[in-house]
Amino acid sequence: MARSQVRDERKKQILKALDECLQEKSFEKTSIKDIARVASVNHGVLHYYFKSKDDILLQYIDYVVDDFKRQVQEILFDSGMEKLSRKNLLKEIFAFVNQKLVLDKRLNRTFIEIWEISLYNKAVRAKLKFAYQEWINVFDMNFKKGIKDTDNSYILSILTVAFWEGMSLFSTIFEKRELDFQQVLDRFLQKILKDL
C-alpha cells in the first residue's frame, strides 16, 4: 500500500474513532487519548496527522460531508438514474437523504454536538456554513432544472435543507411510535413535487 493510502486510511480510522467517542460523551469531555484508544493507536499518532483536537473535528466534518457528496454523486450518475424523470430522480435523492441523513440517529447525535460547538467556535461555524451552503446550492441547481418558478428555487432549497435539519433534530428527540417520520417526509416531498 502506498504511503499516501496508509496516511488516508489512518486518518479515516481516527475520524471514525472520534465519531465513536461522540456517541458516548461530548466533544469537550473527549480527550485526544480517548480518540487514540478507540482508534487503537498511540495518542502521539494523532498529533502526527492532526494539529489539535479541534483540527480532528474540522476534518471529521469534511470527511462526513465529502462522503455524502460522493454517495449523492453516485446516485446522480448511476446508469439507471439518467433515464428517470426529474420527479423520479428527486424521489430517489430524497429517499437517500431521508435514510442516510435525516433518520440516522447516530449521525444526528454527532451533528447536534457539532452545532453546539459551532455556537462558540468560529472555525466550526464557518465549516458548517460552508457545508450547508453547498447543500443549498446543489438543490437550487437541481430545482431550477425542473421547477416552474425558478425565482424561488433558492428559497425552496433553503427550506428543504432547514426542514431536513429540523426532522433530524426531531428524530433524536421523538421515538418512531411518537411521530410518524416517514409520513412527514413523504408529505414534504409531495408538496415539493407539486411545484415541479
Task: Name each model feature, range by range.
Residues I93, V97, F111-W115, T160, ...:
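Short alpha-helical scaffolding segments that buttress acidic/His motifs in well-ordered protein cores
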Residues Q13, C21-Q59:
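Helix-turn-helix
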Residues M1-E9:
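N-terminal intrinsically disordered/low-complexity leader segments
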Residues K51-D55, G80-L84, N98, V102, ...:
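Residues in soluble alpha-helical coiled-coils and helical-bundle/repeat scaffolds
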Residues R125-K129, K145-L196:
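Hydrophobic/aromatic-rich alpha-helical bundle segments in the mid-to-C-terminal region
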Residues I32, D62-K69:
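Short, basic, alpha-helical segments at the C-terminal edge of helix-turn-helix-like DNA-binding modules
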Residues Q59, Q73-L103, L156-T160, Q182:
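Hydrophobic alpha-helical connector segments
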